[in-house]
């Protein structure tokens, strides 16, 4: 394997810990952080960490540690938490790999950027911090994907209005938490407190508008919303699914997929492009904001699953849907690394397809375990 220069790492800095909320690094301008110039970085899918938990620091693990700067994300910590009493073993593995913690950088107005930081820290400390702050964020994340879960056939018996109400209530709770934190900072950091309070107010309004519009649109287009599966309905309507799509191979995977759909109803009657189809022309929630590549990876990966390109199985079941969302999260954040390693071939194929179209230079490797 060959990795030259700083390719793929132009937006990675060495970060510290923000005193208010340690889930994200703050700054926005990468000039505020020293630029990382160390070894090529490697992001490991959870199934690779599983190998090292089961078999210890094998020769492969040592080679990864010595050849790369291994990095992990909050998505990694989320999966570790789901492992229950195995958590300490995963954290030991991260420490043995000398892994750094990767975080997104937000602006001082709490808006996303195309930058990340990686921080050297003890994995147990990072995990404890994650678990302390995770409940409300986890509740929000789980709530926001419920519409998506319903489109994959989950939430049987629940209406779009019911799901939207749940989402709005959870988001309101988070905004209330931010306002409470702002009040605590009024004397010591008045400008930051003002920004936080303003952000919470604006974000709440935008979320309510987005939920109202999306719910109205769904109700217009779905006849039996209580027993609806968007995946089944869509694939049946266009008469395209895994059987047709899984024959497509690189290069130009997304272009080849769009060729299959563009002359089908309803697309033949629309002035749509590939980017419309894969929902990457602009952000659906914040259409006036920059739409970064790592965010587009999320949209592409999810849509590939939806239309049936090497899809995850049984995503109408909550456990399988949660696993698919974690895969999507790993694919997105790993786009900041030089290399991504995974044992899941379907994950590899979808991730490579997204990276190829977006011009992301991260090299994606399939790990095969002999005698497994």
Predicted regions and their residues:
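Active-site-proximal, substrate-binding regions of enzyme catalytic domains
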Residues: 13-336, 346-372
């Amino acid at each position: 394997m060959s990795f030259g220069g700083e390719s793929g790492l132009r937006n990675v800095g060495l970060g510290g810990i923000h005193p208010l909320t340690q889930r994200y690094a703050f700054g926005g301008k990468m000039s505020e952080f020293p630029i990382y110039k160390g070894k090529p970085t490697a992001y490991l899918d959870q199934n690779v960490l599983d190998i090292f938990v089961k078999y210890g620091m094998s020769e492969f693990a040592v080679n990864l540690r010595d050849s790369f700067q291994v990095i992990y994300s909050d998505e990694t910590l989320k999966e570790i938490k789901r492992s229950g009493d195995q958590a300490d073993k995963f954290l030991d593995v991260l420490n043995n790999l000398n892994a750094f913690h990767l975080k997104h950088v937000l602006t001082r107005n709490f808006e996303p950027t195309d930058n990340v930081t990686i921080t050297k820290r003890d994995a147990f400390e990072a995990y404890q911090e994650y678990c302390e702050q995770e409940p409300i964020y986890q509740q929000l994340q789980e709530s926001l994907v419920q519409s998506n879960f319903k489109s994959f056939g989950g939430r049987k018996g629940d209406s779009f209005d019911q799901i939207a109400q749940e989402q709005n209530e959870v988001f309101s709770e988070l905004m209330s938490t931010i306002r409470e934190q702002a009040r605590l900072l009024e004397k010591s950091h008045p400008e930051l407190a003002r920004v936080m309070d303003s952000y919470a107010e604006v974000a709440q309004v935008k979320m309510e508008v987005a939920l109202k519009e999306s719910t109205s649109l769904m109700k217009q287009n779905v006849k039996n919303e209580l027993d609806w599966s968007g995946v089944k309905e869509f694939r049946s309507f266009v008469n395209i699914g895994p059987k047709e799509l899984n024959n497509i191979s690189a290069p130009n995977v997304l272009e080849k997929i769009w060729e299959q759909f563009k002359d089908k109803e309803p697309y033949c009657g629309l002035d749509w492009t590939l980017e419309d189809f894969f929902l990457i022309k602009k952000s659906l929630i914040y259409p006036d904001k920059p739409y970064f590549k790592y965010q587009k990876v999320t949209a592409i990966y999810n849509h590939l699953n939806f239309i049936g390109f090497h899809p995850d199985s049984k995503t109408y079941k909550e456990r399988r849907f949660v696993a698919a969302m974690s895969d999507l999260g790993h694919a997105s954040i790993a786009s900041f690394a030089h290399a991504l390693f995974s044992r899941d071939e379907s994950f590899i194929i979808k991730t490579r397809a997204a990276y190829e179209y977006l011009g992301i230079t991260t090299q994606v490797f399939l790990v095969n375990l002999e005698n497994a």
